[in-house]
Amino acid sequence: MYQPDFPTVPFRLGLYPVVDSVAWIERLLEAGVRTIQLRIKDKRDEEVEADVIAAIALGRRYDARLFINDYWRLAIKHRAYGVHLGQEDLETTDLKAIQAAGLRLGVSTHDDMEIDIALAAKPSYIALGHVFPTQTKQMPSAPQGLAQLARHIDRLADYPTVAIGGISVERAPAVLATGVGSIAVVSAITQAADWRAATAQLLDIAGVGDE
């Protein structure tokens, strides 16, 4: 049963781009995206704080669900909509501080054991990946594929879920057919020959999410 320790999110978050700059946040919110994540890696808090502030301000301007990847202290300080954490971050993050601040929490998973760990944290949503091979980041695990994704969805039937990893415009309908609530994309937009067209196509397929 979906009873998170953090504020709830809609079962369907819709198209969920994951991007590494405020410029991309602004472009995609202008294009109609309403769930988005700022993921800047391997920098100190003071190096990314200005970007976090700007991204959160944009999220508010567009009434969007803006998640900050990893930099949970800054997300709390500047009152982001939510935080997204990888498995490796769960043990070193003060989850109670995120909870007390009223921020939503998303957690990445790659297999059944990591789903167990995520469920124990009772986050707002669970991300399932990587579905297909991806060049966006080095992955220690093998792609899960659609059958494995569908099995996880059956297990998490009433939980908001997000599929991520190698999802393209062409693959998106089959991914959503598993019953997953949302799809996260990276290169399908940021490396597209025409990012506006790719975004519009993905919005047609996945929508903007439930209210």
Swiss-Prot record:
Q: What does the function comment of this entry state? A: Condenses 4-methyl-5-(beta-hydroxyethyl)thiazole monophosphate (THZ-P) and 2-methyl-4-amino-5-hydroxymethyl pyrimidine pyrophosphate (HMP-PP) to form thiamine monophosphate (TMP).
Q: Which reaction does it catalyse?
A: 2-[(2R,5Z)-2-carboxy-4-methylthiazol-5(2H)-ylidene]ethyl phosphate + 4-amino-2-methyl-5-(diphosphooxymethyl)pyrimidine + 2 H(+) = thiamine phosphate + CO2 + diphosphate; 2-(2-carboxy-4-methylthiazol-5-yl)ethyl phosphate + 4-amino-2-methyl-5-(diphosphooxymethyl)pyrimidine + 2 H(+) = thiamine phosphate + CO2 + diphosphate; 4-methyl-5-(2-phosphooxyethyl)-thiazole + 4-amino-2-methyl-5-(diphosphooxymethyl)pyrimidine + H(+) = thiamine phosphate + diphosphate
SUPFAM superfamilies from the xrefs?
A: Thiamin phosphate synthase
Tell me how the cofactor is bound: Binds 1 Mg(2+) ion per subunit.
> Which organism was this protein described from?
Salmonella heidelberg (strain SL476)
The cofactors required by this protein are: Mg(2+)
Q: Return any one Pfam family short name.
A: TMP-TENI
List of residues binding Mg(2+): 70, 89
Q: Which family does it belong to?
A: Belongs to the thiamine-phosphate synthase family.
Top-rank taxon, per record:
Bacteria
Single annotated GO MF: thiamine-phosphate diphosphorylase activity
Q: Which NCBIfam families match?
A: PRK03512.1, thiE
- Mind listing the UniProt keywords for this protein, alphabetically? Magnesium, Metal-binding, Thiamine biosynthesis, Transferase
Q: What are the EC numbers? A: 2.5.1.3
Instruction: Give the GO cellular component terms, alphabetically.
Output: cytoplasm
Give the encoding gene's name: thiE
Q: What class of enzyme is it?
A: transferase
Q: What is the official name of this protein in its record?
A: Thiamine-phosphate synthase
Claim: NADP is one of the keywords in the record:
no
Which residues take part in binding 4-amino-2-methyl-5-(diphosphooxymethyl)pyrimidine? 37-41, 69, 108, 137
Q: Where does 2-[(2R,5Z)-2-carboxy-4-methylthiazol-5(2H)-ylidene]ethyl phosphate bind?
A: 134-136, 166, 186-187
Q: In which pathway does it act?
A: Cofactor biosynthesis; thiamine diphosphate biosynthesis; thiamine phosphate from 4-amino-2-methyl-5-diphosphomethylpyrimidine and 4-methyl-5-(2-phosphoethyl)-thiazole: step 1/1
Q: Which InterPro entries match?
A: Aldolase_TIM, ThiamineP_synth_sf, ThiamineP_synth_TenI, TMP_synthase
Biological process, per Gene Ontology: thiamine biosynthetic process; thiamine diphosphate biosynthetic process
